[in-house]
Regions:
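Ligand-binding pockets and gating/stacking loops
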Residues: 1-234
C-alpha cells in the first residue's frame, strides 16, 4: 500500500488519511514523494561507516529481539507493524530506487505524462503545466509500482489549506483553483489509463477516482463555491 501525496505536502489530517483504522497497524500506507531528491525518508543509512554487512547483522539482532518481545505480547499489532516496516525497508533499499528512476522511460512516455518540462521554475499561482508535471509524475510512478507488484497505490491531488489555496476546497475562486487542478490531473490520468491498457495491466487493475465531496451549484460571495455534502463523486 503506497501513498503518493500532493507535491506541496499532505492533505488535511495528514497521514491519518491512510492509517489502518480498525485493521492491524501494518495495513497502513507507506508515503512516497517521487518528486523529492529522497522520495522515501531514511531509506538508506546516513553514516558512511555503516556497511551492508553491519546493517544486515543489526537487522538480524533486531529481528531476534523483536520476536522475543512479540511472543510475550500476543495480539498487539503495533510491534508486528514495526517489524514489517523494517522488512519492507530492507526490500525497498534494493527495489525503490529503481522504481523511482524514470531515466529509461521513452521521451514519448514522459511527454504523455506531462513530464516534458522538467526543471521549470513555477510561480506561486496555480497553473496547468505544474499540475500536469507533478501529478503526471505520480501517475507514472504508480504504473511502475504496479508493474513491480505493489497491490494498492493511492494518488493525491491538493494539499492542506493555505493562501492562495492550492487544493479543491475552492471557497474563493473555483475557476482559479479547479481549472488548473482538473486540467493537470486529466493529463496524467489519461496517460496512466492508456499506458496500463497498452501494457495489459488494465485487465487486473481497478481504478477508483474519488473525492471528498462536491461544491454547491451557486456562488459563495463572489467566485467561490461552498461545500455540498450531497454530491460525493466517484
Amino acid at each position: 500500500f503506497v501513498v503518493l501525496p500532493d507535491h506541496r505536502g499532505y492533505a488535511s489530517n495528514g497521514p491519518k488519511n491512510w492509517g489502518s483504522a480498525f485493521l492491524p497497524a501494518y495495513s497502513q500506507g507507506t508515503t512516497v514523494f517521487p518528486q523529492r531528491e529522497n522520495p522515501i525518508e531514511n531509506l538508506l543509512p546516513q553514516a558512511e561507516y555503516i556497511t551492508s554487512g553491519s546493517e544486515r547483522d543489526g537487522a538480524d539482532l533486531l529481528r531476534r529481539l523483536n520476536s522475543k518481545y512479540n511472543s510475550a505480547r500476543p495480539g498487539d499489532s503495533r510491534l508486528e507493524a514495526r517489524i514489517r516496516s523494517y522488512e519492507l525497508a530492507a526490500k525497498m533499499q534494493l527495489s525503490a530506487p529503481e522504481a523511482m528512476d524514470l531515466s529509461k522511460e521513452t521521451a514519448a512516455t514522459l511527454k504523455a505524462y506531462g513530464l516534458d518540462r522538467q526543471g521549470t521554475n513555477y510561480g506561486p499561482d496555480i497553473n496547468v503545466p505544474e499540475e500536469a508535471e507533478y501529478f503526471g509524475r505520480k501517475c507514472l510512478i504508480a504504473r511502475r509500482l504496479i508493474e513491480r507488484g505493489v497491490r494498492f497505490v493511492q494518488i493525491w491531488s491538493g494539499n492542506d489549506n493555505g493562501f492562495p489555496r492550492r487544493n479543491w476546497d475552492s471557497h474563493e475562486d473555483i475557476q482559479r483553483d479547479h481549472g488548473p487542478l482538473a486540467n493537470g490531473m486529466a493529463i496524467g490520468t489519461a496517460a496512466l489509463i492508456k499506458d496500463l491498457k497498452q501494457r495489459g495491466l488494465l485487465e487486473d487493475t481497478i481504478i477508483l477516482w474519488t473525492t471528498e465531496f462536491g461544491r454547491m451549484p451557486s456562488s459563495q460571495r463572489s467566485t467561490g463555491r461552498d461545500h455540498n455534502p450531497f454530491t460525493f463523486t466517484n
